[in-house]
Amino acid sequence: MKKYTILIPIYNDRESLTKLIENINEELNGLNAEVSILVINDASSQQIIDTYPNLENIHSFEIINMKQNRGHARCIASGLKYIYEKKKFDYVIPMDGD
């Protein structure tokens, strides 16, 4: 089974992130793959929801909170570094949170 990690940088867009997570979970129904989601919170001033119920098609969900706002590209770079050091995967899918 292939292992995918979806990398989502986010800044002050809680509603879009919630919809995106739910849509990803729905689209994965019946797919023979192990999919994890890693959200990089770019020091949002909004509270980012860190628990989503009923994510039966998503293997793991994790949020990394940046200490200060560093921008979209820096979030992706930080996320990729984390994934390469900490995760076992076959593919990484960077995806905007909005």
State what each model feature region is:
Residues 2-8, 17, 24, 35-40:
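Hydrophobic targeting segments
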Residues 13-28, 47:
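Short, well-formed alpha-helical segments that are part of the catalytic scaffolds
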Residues 31-35, 59:
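A generic structural motif
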Residues 41-49:
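A conserved acidic beta->alpha catalytic loop
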Residues 52-86:
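Conserved donor nucleotide-binding strand/loop of the catalytic core
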